[in-house]
Structures are given as C-alpha cells and as structure tokens.
Amino acid sequence: MTREAAIAHALAHFDSGAFQRDVARRVAIPTESQNPERAPELRRYLVDEMTPAFEALGFTCRIIEEPRAKGPFLFAERIEDPSLLTVFGYGHGDVIRGLDDGWEPGLSPWTLTERGDRWYGRGVVDNKGQHSANLAAQASVISTRGRLGFNAKWLIEMGEETGSPGLREVCSAHLDLFRSDVLIGSDGPRPDRNRPTIYLGTRGGASMDVFIDAREGGHHSGNWGGLLSSPAIQLAHALASITSPRGQILIPEWLPTGGLPDPVRRALSGLELDMGEDSPAIDPGWGEPGLSGPEKVFGWSSFEILAMESGNPRGPVNAVPPRAWARCQLRYVVGIEMADIIPALRRHLDRAGFPFVQVEPAREEVFPATRLDPDSPWVGWALDSMRRSTGKEPALLPNLGGSLPNDAFSEILALPTLWVPHSFNGCSQHAPNEHWTAELAREALVVMTGLYWDVPESGIARRR
C-alpha cells in the first residue's frame, strides 16, 4: 500500500462523517478545567472516550495521577519495535468555560453544530479537534500499512487551560516511560489559514498583579479630594511608564538582546497574517517600531494590561478609592530571563518613582519561552512532507505567538518539538462561538497522515 492510499483512507474517513462524529462526541463532554464542579468530566473524557479510542488502535493505556494537577493524565503507547523511531504526541482534553449565554441563538458549547463550512462547539479547535485529527491520521496509516512503522506515545492532559499544573512533574517522574525521538503535536492557529504551518516552540507567558493599597476604606471625594493620594491615578502613571504611548516596551530586560535574530527574521520574511474575516483591523503603528506584524507576534515581546479596577465600576460613589489594581501580562521570546521578569519590573518602577506600587505573580505556573533550532533535520523533513501532501508552501514559525507548556517536552524530556496547528486566528477559541472549518479539518488529516507515513523514511537517527 502507498502513501497516497493512506491519505485517501483519511479523506474517506472524513467524508463519511465518521471524523465529525468523533469530534462531536468529545465536544459533548463539558471538560471545563476552570470549573471545579466539572472535575468528574475531566476523568470521564480520558477513561470513557479517549482510552477506548487508543485501545482500538492497539495502544496500551494508563491513567497517571499527579497531586498538583487539575485532573488526571492519560498515557498511551504502541511499541512496534524498540529499534524504531518513537514519536511523542500531546493533546489537552480540557477546555475553558463554556460561556453558554454568549453563544449565538441555536448554538451550544456542548453540541457540535454545523453551519455552512463551520463546526461550532467548545474545544472543537482547542484542543479536541486537533488531537482527534492526529489520532485519526495515525489510524489511517495503521489501516493502510498494517503498522505505523514507528513507535507512538501519547500524553493527554486535562489542565492546560489552567497553566498545566503538574505536567512538568509528570514528565520529570516518567523520563524513561516517555523517552522518544521527537514530539509532533498540534495546538494553536496558523498565521495564514491557507498555508500549512510548523512552529518550533512558543512565546513564554508571565502574568502579574500590579497594585496599590493606599489605606483602609474610601474617603469622601469632596472632603478629602486633593488631600489624599489617588491610587488609580498613581497606578495609571506607573503602568504608562512600562511602554510608550504606542505600546513599545521600555524595560530592556523584557526584550531580546541584540534585536531580532537573523534566523528568525529570515523565517518570517514574506509571511502574511490572516487574522480572520470577523477580526478587527491590525493597528500598524502599535508595538515595536520597525518590525512587521509577524515579527511583532512571533519574534518579539508584547505587554498587555488585561484588566484594571479601582473603586466600584458598577456603582461609582463620591469617594477616593483606597486601592487600585491591574492584571498585566508579558508574552516574551527566547533570550529573556524568565526569573528576572518581575524583578526587572520592580527595578523599573523604583527608578521611575513608584516604590509604593506592589508587584506579585498572578499565577503559580509560568510558561517559559522555547524554540527548536530551525536547522534541525526534523524541520526540513517536516516541511518537505507537508509540501508533498498539500502542494502548498508551508509556513515556518520560530515559535507560536501564544504560550504552551512546550518546555515540558523540549527541556525536561529533551525532545525536538514540531507543532503543526490546524486552527486559524478567527476561530473564537477562548470566546463564545468557537468554531473550526471543514476545509481546515479535512486538510489536517491530509497533512498529518503524510507526516506519520513519512516518519520511517525520514532517515533521522534515533536519540540514544
């Protein structure tokens, strides 16, 4: 049997509606990891849904518990021959909150609904549809070839949307069990929905609370205004000192030393951003001057104020508020020292005259920045495979603009990491009306079936 036959098998699986039914069944399990009441659903997804799917393909499965995690982990492996290459797969079955009331009439986060070319449902792209596509592609290779031609290991976690607590501990505790030659996973969007894409790592993400606690209780703004310091005004000035009025970061420790690396600039040359037909227009003058849009997202750091509060926004009263607070976030690239992010902000605020502004980490888990060397033989192999499968020129991203727990694989397991996203920027993945397109879902099966078929022919030596 041939590569073309394997891809034809995958397309027949899609065209029959079987793949959509698999995704629909998984979307119907409300695996909200941010909702403690959904904890039983996290386990049900692994035990009742994914374990049978893996076992049907000859995998052996086990549930791994970790006290720090929001839910269990599923490890599945299919060992055909210890001398063969081993591919490690990853997915997360948890989703963010459904936000049920915000969906368009006739749509529900827990019912896969097809409207035109779109499939609506919570998790349809983040991440249930994406790891379903990869597993279906492996099934097509097995059905066509009679075997994968390599060993396969998978880890499905249920806490990615809460920062992947426990994932690093699980990887550290199971180094031998998880030993592999490469990670091939799928999450996140393509920058251009029409171009198959590989990204080699992720920007890091660090969230922090920046706040002022000036005094106990509010005081009448008529009697005390002009006499008491205003935490809101002070915090606004402090936050404004972090960037220019156009969003250029002014803390040197948060930026790549020496500017944009030449390999990153070359990889991003000519890349166009497709943010989706329902997305806002890009503000070309925002952010770091002199960089293209792709360079700002994939090669540079960005700072955001995610939320701010002082007083009572829903019911303002005539009082000087005692407190002002902001949740901030830095997305950063390889080369920024993760442990120095908050200390650098502290030093900056002190220099700027704001020693009274307090800074605290907003969450325990921080995603480090990671990036595989673009010259890795796995990169050229994957790009060639995708060209062959689709007839399109794939995009190569040094890293995703968002954050993933890629460091668990690239640093702890020491794996080369290839991420092949099957989504697009306008998919509403963390909002109501999350959706995939049938066109992208179908092409995902083509791309992944070709990649898995080509693994035995890669000529890349096993790691020792």
Tell me the role of every PLM-derived stretch.
Residues 225-246:
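A short core secondary-structure module
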Residues 119, 123-201, 460-463:
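Acidic/histidine-rich catalytic neighborhood of metal-dependent amide-processing enzymes
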Residues 125, 216, 330-338, 367:
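A generic structural motif
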Residues 2-124, 143-150, 328:
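Acidic/His- and Gly-rich active-site-bordering loop/insert found
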Residues 93-95, 118, 155-164, 186-190, ...:
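Acidic, glycine-rich active-site loops and adjacent beta-strand->loop/helix elements
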Residues 198-213, 418-423:
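Flexible glycine/proline-rich, aromatic-decorated loop/lid segments
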